[in-house]
């Protein structure tokens, strides 16, 4: 798996070990498939809404507004997040960004107006870690999910960083 990101894993990854070919089960399968992933995403999404730093009590006006005034959109967000996890975990479902961007997942445009700071991103990542622990996801799979999430930190925080750079100029 060296040199391969989570997003590049195929449904079944074939690796060579000791001269023999082994088929490794995809992260998608090890997580339990779409229904298990959807349960984790639903729990995680609800936890983020309740998180005092990044949810309804956030001091970030954009995050506060999203988590109070846009909750009718939460089921759709849970669906999109589920597709995203299934996709990056090597499952059969494909995530398609609702707004085009610099990468196939285009997270920078979806998050730009939220102005998510790096510290706020880390709080969301910690919430994801707690959710994975709640569901007793094994360490290997937990680490892979968190690595896939962390790989998009610069995209998600781009709006904050651009705003901070403009304010400093």
Regions found by a protein language model. Name each.
Residues 3-169:
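Core of compact, soluble alpha-helical bundle domains
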């Amino acid at each position: 798996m060296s040199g391969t990101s989570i997003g590049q894993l195929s449904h079944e990854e074939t690796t060579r070990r000791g001269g023999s070919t082994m088929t490794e089960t995809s992260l998608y399968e090890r997580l339990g498939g779409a229904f298990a992933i959807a349960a984790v995403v639903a729990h995680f999404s609800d936890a983020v809404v309740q998180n005092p730093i990044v949810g309804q009590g956030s001091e970030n006006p954009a995050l506060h507004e999203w988590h109070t005034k846009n909750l009718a959109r939460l089921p759709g967000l849970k669906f999109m997040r589920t597709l995203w996890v299934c996709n990056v975990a090597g499952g059969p479902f494909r995530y398609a960004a609702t707004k085009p961007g610099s990468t196939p997942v285009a997270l920078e445009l979806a998050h730009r107006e939220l102005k998510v700071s790096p510290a706020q991103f880390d709080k969301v990542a910690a919430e994801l870690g707690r959710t994975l622990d709640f569901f007793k996801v094994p360490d290997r799979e937990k680490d892979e999910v968190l690595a896939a999430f962390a790989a998009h930190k610069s995209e998600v925080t781009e709006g904050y960083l651009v705003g901070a750079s403009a304010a400093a100029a």
